[in-house]
Each structure stands twice: as structure tokens, then as C-alpha cells.
From Swiss-Prot:
The lineage of its organism: Bacteria, Pseudomonadati, Pseudomonadota, Gammaproteobacteria, Enterobacterales. It is found in: Cytoplasm. Disulfide bonds: none annotated. It is an enzyme of class 2 (transferase). It comes from Yersinia enterocolitica serotype O:8 / biotype 1B (strain NCTC 13174 / 8081). This is Propionate kinase. Its EC number is 2.7.2.15. GO terms for biological process: acetate metabolic process; propanediol catabolic process; propionate catabolic process. It comes from the Bacteria.
Length: 412
């Protein structure tokens, strides 16, 4: 068995991919090696961009790619042309990131016609993502009919939330008839980093109380107890929760009809306002990018500094509430683009949490060590590089091929 597995994230105009070798062909033993990774951008345009990286070598070309099918065909040809594989038959499994599994999917699943139909039906909950995810599945099933296909849902990890954590206090029929509830997102990332952290701590994940902070242009916090998601900050949509790059996060809902009536905005315009014009961008007036706002704050821009403090304060408030819900905390995780790379963001968030045992070591934080808490601190603070693609590949092994997977530590 070749053991090559592809992880796919299909977007409306993009296709992100990684190819892994998950089994040693000589010994049959489990191992994890990235063979290549890449991204197709501007699908549907005459100047689409195809990026492929194999080890330290990178190729980039501009060409017309009309749709996802053409993109997939070009990608698979490139794998052979650049000697990544000798034959498409070597790819034994494909894992697809799917945005929304609703209440139907509490785990990754082997894709059947019935599963694919349900993914498309759940497009009512994720109209921008599920339909294109489903299209990507169909395209790769045609291109690689021999390969097992597995759907990995962003929402699945959070299906362990209790009713008191996922219900909104609205009339019951809105949950029963329309499925309005907290679903949460970034589940694959939170699941991966919590497993890595537990492995590095040398303790079983089931014994730990963890708060995971996935901080990027989209940000979410997750309370993890006994290895399961107990609560998460994103809700019915990824708009909910903490302040983000361009999203407001949680606000008083009555603000929205007030703005509608005062400024005569439509529902579409209001949705654009809270999703695309708010957050760091809205408060700073500069950028949605944390690095740009941070630089402006360093140069004396008061609104930029305020945006950073508001960002940290909203996150601290959620961390505190989750510690209460978990009955304590053993580890605080930072992941995502901001969480992994911004030492100042980590410092600002942890600064007011020392009374909870969250005591940051400044030198370790500056050096981006894995554990950055003070030596005597009761709570571990970890920087964990997320790897959703690897988690997807592992789920293909587990779900489709019924093979055991390595501890998460293998890639950290």
C-alpha cells in the first residue's frame, strides 16, 4: 500500500492542497511526511495562479483555469510531471475540509452519495462554503475514483457541547425548525492543537482542562475538557464570539436594526458591515491585519492601540468564563496566525490573567518556545502550530482505512 493521502480545501475561487505519505512503503509502518503542498488562486479567471512546493523547491505559473474541475486536473498532472508521484493510483485517500456538518455529523465520515447530498442540504447553514466544498468532492471523486473520500467537518468537534452551551434563548421553534444554535468552527484546529499540547505535557488529553485560542483574521476560543469541546466562542456563524480582523464578534443585537433604521441600510449591507468592516479594521481605521495595526500603535496611533487592547480584552473575558466552566485550567494554547506569531498579542492577553495562574515568561515568549509559562507557574502556556491538513489526512486513515494514527507530537 502506497499510503499517499491528499487533503483538500476547496473554496469558491481557490483550491488548497497537501499530499502526505502516511505509510512507509517498505515496512508498512505509520509515518507522516509532506510530499508537496500548494494553492490554486483566481479559479474562473484567465490569469489563475498555480503554486506548488515540493520540499524547498517552488513552482508558480499563471494560466487560464475555468473551474474547479480544470484546477484539479492541472494539479494532478503537475504531481506526475514534477515526480511527486508516478501514478494517480498511489493516492489511496482524499480528505475534504467541509465547513458545516450541522447536527448530522459529529465526526469525520466516509463520503457516500447520501453523505454528499446531506452536505449540499446543509448549504442553507453555510451558503458560501458547503456548496463549493461539495463541488470539490465531486471533482476529485471523478478524477480519483479509486481513492477513499472522507469529509472532515469544521463543526464536528463541537458537537459534544451541552444544550446549555449551544442553545440560544430564543423561541424553541427556531432551534427545532431552523436549526438555530451554536455550532462553532475551527474544530479541526482546536482538536489538533489540544492533542499536541497534551502529548508535549506527557499527560492524557482526557485528564486535562484546556483553553485553546485560535487567533487569526478569524478567531475563536474553545474550552476543552476530557478531550472534548465543552464550549466555543463562534456560534451559529463564524461572525460570533471575540473581535476579529473585520468581524465585530458579539455585539448587542439591537444595534443592527438601529443602524438599519437610522441609515436606511438593507440587511445585506448590515451583514457586510459586521462581517467585513468591523473588528480591528473598524476600530483602528487602518487595516484588518494585526501586524499593520500593531505597527501603527507602535508609531503612536491611539485608535490602533485601542483596537489591540479591545481585541485582547474580549479574548481575556472568554478565557476567564471558560476557566469557570471547566472548573480550572491546566493549559492555555495559542495557535493561528496571530497566536503563533505575535509575541505582543500573547503578552497583552496574558497580562491580566496572572491571578488565575497564567504567568507568562517574557524571554520564552520572545523566543517563541513551545512552552512559555514561568517555571513555577501552575498553568502551562503553549504555542502550538496548527496543522489542519495533517489532521484531515489522519482522519482519512482512521475513518476510511481503519488504520491507527501516530500521536499528534509527530509533527510539532
Amino acid at each position: 500500500m502506497s499510503g499517499k493521502i491528499m487533503a483538500i480545501n476547496a473554496g469558491s475561487s481557490s483550491l488548497k492542497f497537501q499530499l502526505f505519505s502516511m505509510l512507509n512503503e517498505q515496512t508498512g509502518q505509520h509515518h507522516e511526511q509532506v510530499l508537496c503542498q500548494g494553492l490554486i488562486e483566481r479559479i474562473g479567471m484567465d490569469d489563475a495562479i498555480f503554486n506548488l512546493r515540493v520540499g524547498d523547491v517552488q513552482w508558480r505559473e499563471t494560466l487560464p483555469i475555468a473551474d474547479c474541475r480544470q484546477g484539479a486536473e492541472h494539479l494532478l498532472r503537475a504531481l506526475i510531471e514534477h515526480n511527486v508521484i508516478d501514478s494517480l493510483d498511489e493516492i489511496i485517500g482524499v480528505g475534504h475540509r467541509v465547513a458545516h456538518g450541522g447536527e448530522t455529523f459529529a465526526d469525520s465520515v466516509l463520503i457516500t452519495p447520501q453523505v454528499l447530498d446531506k452536505i449540499e442540504q446543509l448549504g442553507t447553514l453555510a451558503p458560501l462554503h458547503n456548496p463549493v466544498n461539495a463541488l470539490g468532492i465531486r471533482v476529485f471523486q471523478l478524477a480519483l475514483p479509486h481513492a477513499s473520500a472522507v469529509a472532515v467537518f469544521d463543526t464536528a468537534f463541537h458537537q459534544t457541547l451541552s444544550q446549555t452551551s449551544f442553545l440560544y434563548p430564543l423561541p424553541w421553534r427556531y432551534y427545532e425548525e431552523l436549526g438555530i444554535r451554536r455550532y462553532g468552527f475551527h474544530g479541526t484546529s482546536h482538536k489538533y492543537v489540544s492533542a499536541v499540547c497534551a502529548e508535549r505535557m506527557g499527560q492524557p488529553l482526557a485528564a486535562l482542562r484546556i483553553v485553546s485560542c485560535h487567533l487569526g483574521n478569524g478567531s475563536s476560543i474553545c474550552a476543552i475538557g476530557h478531550g472534548k469541546s465543552v464550549n466555543t466562542s463562534m456560534g451559529f456563524t463564524p461572525q460570533a464570539g471575540v473581535m476579529m480582523g473585520t468581524r465585530s464578534g458579539d455585539i448587542d443585537p439591537s444595534i443592527l436594526p438601529f443602524i438599519q433604521q437610522t441609515e436606511g441600510k438593507s440587511a445585506v449591507e448590515i451583514n457586510h458591515l459586521i462581517n467585513n468592516q468591523s473588528g480591528l479594521l473598524g476600530i483602528s481605521g487602518i487595516s484588518h491585519d494585526y501586524r499593520d495595526v500593531e505597527q501603527a500603535a507602535d508609531n503612536g496611533n491611539r485608535r490602533a492601540a485601542l483596537a489591540l487592547e479591545l481585541f485582547a480584552e474580549r479574548i481575556r473575558a472568554v478565557i476567564g468564563s471558560y476557566i469557570v466552566q471547566l472548573g480550572g485550567i491546566d493549559a492555555l494554547i495559542f495557535t493561528g496566525g496571530i497566536g503563533e506569531n505575535s509575541r505582543s498579542a500573547r503578552q497583552q492577553i496574558c497580562r491580566e490573567l496572572t491571578f488565575l495562574g497564567i504567568e507568562l515568561d517574557q524571554e520564552k515568549n520572545i523566543r517563541n518556545q513551545f512552552f512559555i509559562q514561568q517555571d513555577t507557574a501552575p498553568v502551562q502556556i503553549a504555542i502550538v502550530n496548527t496543522n489542519e491538513e495533517l489532521m484531515i489526512a489522519r482522519d482519512v486513515l482512521r475513518v476510511a482505512l481503519n488504520l491507527p494514527v501516530q500521536p499528534a507530537l509527530a509533527t510539532q
